[in-house]
């Protein structure tokens, strides 16, 4: 199967969502391990061409320096991938808060979107990301629900 579009991307957030250090939880899967698993995956000769990336710990500190973000971009590219969509850390319990909340919550929500835009700008300028969106949702219920 040969194609140029759409590019096939793997989402990195399953390595984080529902994971943790509490009793009964599976530990988060490291970014490098997720990239290695993605690089090894193949069905009928088709492999992943890129990743879609959740901008939160432990994979990424959303407040990381440009140099730290470039190092992450280099790791992703070294595995043969480009970065596509970025998932802004908008939920309560990450950086953001509900878009439907009070003024303080809405400010946190917008700050999280701005952080994602900054990361996108660094990845774009560094050459690791040439297309994609910044994914957001209302974050109405947060990560606890």
Task: Label every model-predicted segment.
Residues 1-133, 143:
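N-terminal pre-domain/capping segments
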